[in-house]
């Protein structure tokens, strides 16, 4: 379709259809994190937020404007593990939210099925299966192709194929991906360049979010206690993760937000405060 420049100049532009703030329908986005950080839990809870038209289903606080059908293709975990996650999340949902999510969310385990989106037959089945979806989650990217992850040419082809799915379904495609060993070692997993493999994976995506573990320094600077402001500390920092956006093409980048890991691994938003030293009660500035 050729853009009508006269209409574009003279008429009000269309309202962009965001899946959640900054993530545009019909585009490809990424969520990156080290292994065992909580990205699959965050993505599953986000999928439920988009699938549920009731406010009670938005556990991660995305505040989506529109909701709809969501397809979650889980390539890393067996069915039993997925059931445990759903059960843990369900404890924080009311009955109405659970019923709407059951109607609109399809959670499909694909571990061991050797799905390959670069195979034309597999690709056609994916498009047919996801035809009326608003969001498609691919967990994780490495489970759905056989290309060279370090080749910019191969990864550009892969993202282009995901864009083909997005174009044919109208859905946003969110793929989950791991970060490189170097970025994890240097605590730089919140950077746009942190993703493992070729730069085209993120350069060609239109949105990229991250989930990062709380660092030791952050645990000394932050408190989850509004009154005495005692630091979270190294012993408890494993219960907190930070979500943020490292790339956003269509809107202003939002502020990072913190989540606390609850029973079963569920992530729930938490408000953190600047910690104070117990001895002098002065505010620590180490996180600035």
Locations of regions flagged by a protein language model:
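N-terminal pre-Walker A segment at the start of P-loop NTPase domains
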Residues: 1-19
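Conserved, well-folded catalytic cores of nucleic-acid-processing
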Residues: 50-53, 89-92, 140, 144-147, ...
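Conserved alpha/beta core segments of nucleic-acid transaction machinery
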Residues: 248-288
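Structured loop/turn residues at beta-strand edges in well-structured enzyme cores
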Residues: 26, 68, 131-132, 169, ...
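Phosphate-binding/switch region of NTP-binding enzymes
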Residues: 30-32, 36, 41, 155-265
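Conserved inter-motif catalytic segment of the P-loop NTP-binding fold
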Residues: 15, 65-153, 157, 164
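Walker A/P-loop NTP-binding active-site region of P-loop NTPases
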Residues: 19-96
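Short gly/ser/thr-rich secondary-structure transition/capping motifs
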Residues: 10-15, 117, 189-192
